[in-house]
């Protein structure tokens, strides 16, 4: 199986797990239950969770299949027994490996009724992603993506969190190039056919 097909398949598995978890996020459920569900879907497709056992540092392997963050937690929360409540805003991030190639995705949802401002933040962040994707074209420059994300977010009176960036993805979960969510257009590596990028946006 070619590398492009493997990455597509890993993305398909991630999308299936994403849909299952999103549907299961309800008041009373725990983030640990969401973690177990994601792992079940991933493994039932013959894939391996990307995050479980991943070592950002040699001494600290990540213990779960998903990152699950509540409300003010920006990213990389570890699932546990905390129950999801009405009005929570939760973010889920995870990946899957197929034939040695990674897929990676994240989403944020409101649980039941949330404030108008919270929903607007979710909507603006989502649209910022699509603005960045529009600039991910062969012959463009990496920071064309960065600039589009920043311009849309700031035009809607939000800010990008600069400490967290997107990245290349393939045989490793995190590969070069890093993809910041800010900057001037027309800079950085030339975008070429076959590149795989994971855009990672956090707005406040």
Predicted regions and their residues:
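Ser/Thr-glycine-rich phosphate-binding loops at phosphate-binding pockets of nucleotides
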Residues: 30, 201-204
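Catalytic-core "active-site belt" of small-molecule-metabolizing enzymes
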Residues: 4, 12-27, 31, 40-47, ...
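Short, small-residue-biased leader/transition segments that mark boundaries at the very start
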Residues: 1-6, 204
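Translation machinery proteins
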Residues: 41-75
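Acidic/histidine-enriched ion/cofactor-binding microenvironments in catalytic or ligand-binding pockets
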Residues: 62, 67-101, 177-202
């Amino acid at each position: 199986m070619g590398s492009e097909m493997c990455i597509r398949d890993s993305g398909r598995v991630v999308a299936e797990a994403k849909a299952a978890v999103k549907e299961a996020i309800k008041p009373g459920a725990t983030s640990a239950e969401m973690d177990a569900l994601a792992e079940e879907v991933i493994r039932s497709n013959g894939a391996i969770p990307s995050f479980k056992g991943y070592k950002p540092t040699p001494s600290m392997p990540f213990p779960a299949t998903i990152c699950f963050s509540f409300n003010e937690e920006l990213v990389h929360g570890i699932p546990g027994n905390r129950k999801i409540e009405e009005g929570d805003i939760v973010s889920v991030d995870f990946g899957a490996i197929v034939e040695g190639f990674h897929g990676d995705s994240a989403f944020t949802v409101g649980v039941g009724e949330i404030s108008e401002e919270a929903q607007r933040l979710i909507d603006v962040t989502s649209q910022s992603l699509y603005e960045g994707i529009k600039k991910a074209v062969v012959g463009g420059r990496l920071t064309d993506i960065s600039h589009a994300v920043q311009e849309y977010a700031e035009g809607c009176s939000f800010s990008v969190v600069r400490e967290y960036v997107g990245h290349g993805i393939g045989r490793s979960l995190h590969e070069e190039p890093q993809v910041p969510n800010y900057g001037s257009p027309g800079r950085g590596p030339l975008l070429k056919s076959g590149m795989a990028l994971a855009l990672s946006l956090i707005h406040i």
